[in-house]
């Protein structure tokens, strides 16, 4: 073959899938991070760096489930022979722990000094939004109903379409650049310029109508002297996530914050999450304040009403009968009543002893004994009801 007939190109036989290895590893790593977030949610939702943040920051959290394959040191220093007899099969055991049934040494934990290696963990940067997406996915307000005189249809705009014409303010730069690159590459010059009219892509919106109904949540918290630092932190952690859940998932929901000791008062949100008080405990005062708010501001004919009360259960014994009566009165006007009790050491609770006699499907309670119970309390109070639709 002459020189003039020699091809001016070469065909590569290279395995091009190897060029995606970095991208594939990155995707696999991100999937493992998301899986770790999901598996560690009960502990993550009460991380102080998250609860005390402004809700917008990216926070670093330890995720210990991202173990990579590695050669580990044999702490017992057993000697093994590396040569086989040649007839091994897939799945055969190649070595066993030679410690004679004793537990093998591992990474050191607990108090005191030691000589064992530590346990590695990955400190991932996670945004509040990522946690919310994993946490709120299966939560909803229970028994939500349509109410009279409501604007039951909410309009909002979604950018869910791409067109070749539109407003310059809505141009999709990424899709436009990709379109130009593809067209130029087909002409033998792989570059992002020039950009022609045919390359332009515009994001276009549609008005979406969805049914909705007004709701009010009454966040009631015991701030008496018996509520210590840990008890108040647990209660505020629950209300922190409850508030974010409601504002993320529902557009027409009001939240009233009520703090109480022997007396109850409506307080601003900032004060509810930061101010500490002392004194005795009369829980009936907060239920009276809730009924007062409902009568004056939130008619059951127009609102779905959800009271949530958190306390340590250490109530004045003579007040318990009044509490039960007022809770039953509240439930006649509400869609659901939730009571959360922070009781770390499983001590006797005068209030819970009285509430266990309430037989009503709209009364829900949860006892929180450890930080992870904030997650489980949210799942219990806001669980999805099978087949439940807005009536």
Curated annotation (Swiss-Prot):
Coiled-coil residue windows: none
InterPro entries the UniProt entry points to: Spore_YhbH, UPF0229
Cited Pfam families: DUF444
Bias (Polar residues): 1-16
Compositionally skewed regions (Gly residues) per UniProt: 98-115
Bias type Basic and acidic residues, positions: 21-31
Start and end residues of each stretch annotated as Disordered: 1-31, 80-117
Protein family according to the UniProt entry: Belongs to the UPF0229 family.
Listed name of the protein: UPF0229 protein BCA_0588
